[in-house]
């Protein structure tokens, strides 16, 4: 682990052990800083962990990175009760797997709006949220978890991601640089 990642591991571990501490830990960082890798490592010491993301594609990426059983937040905490005029109607499922979890890990949290965030927290389970505060926000209604400052902010890009051209260009812009015309 890098020194920054090691600090994050220690901070999240201390938060997990503190039963009277805050329900949410915000582990934020740029793409390629190892947020998902840290979450998978931390989950190894927790009995019942549920992984979720706002979109199915993000949940698939989580599964590919070792987050076993990652699913959408909606499928984790809601149940379909009816369809009216062809539109599905979902309600919070008090007996969802989230109710029995010791930890819920949510990735791509910039997409989570207030209602979804409050519903997620209603289970009373510790929630580790992962996100990039520099990610473009959705058009409306999100930012429930990103409105507050992160508990830990990872800024060091690691070797696996450092050669990624998208990450390289985003870092260039983030640091005030300009993109040259050309093909990328």
Indicate where each model-derived feature is located.
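Conserved ATP-binding/catalytic motifs of P-loop helicase motor domains
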Residues: 1-184
């Amino acid at each position: 682990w890098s020194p920054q990642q090691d600090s994050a591991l220690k901070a999240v571990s201390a938060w997990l052990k503190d039963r009277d501490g805050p329900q949410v830990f915000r582990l934020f960082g740029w793409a390629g800083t190892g947020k998902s890798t840290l979450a998978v490592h931390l989950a190894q010491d927790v009995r019942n962990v549920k992984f979720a993301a706002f979109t199915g594609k993000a949940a698939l990426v989580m599964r590919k990175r070792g987050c076993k059983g990652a699913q959408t937040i909606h499928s984790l905490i809601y149940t379909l009760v009816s369809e009216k005029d062809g539109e599905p109607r979902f309600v919070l499922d008090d007996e969802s797997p989230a109710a029995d979890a010791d930890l819920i890990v949510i990735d791509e949290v910039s997409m989570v709006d207030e209602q979804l965030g409050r519903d997620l927290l209603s289970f009373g389970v510790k929630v580790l949220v992962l996100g990039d505060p520099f990610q473009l926000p959705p058009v409306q209604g999100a930012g429930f978890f990103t409105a507050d400052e992160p508990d830990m902010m990872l800024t060091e890009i690691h070797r696996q991601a450092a050669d990624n051209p998208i990450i390289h260009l985003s870092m260039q812009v983030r640091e005030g640089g300009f993109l040259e015309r050309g093909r990328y």
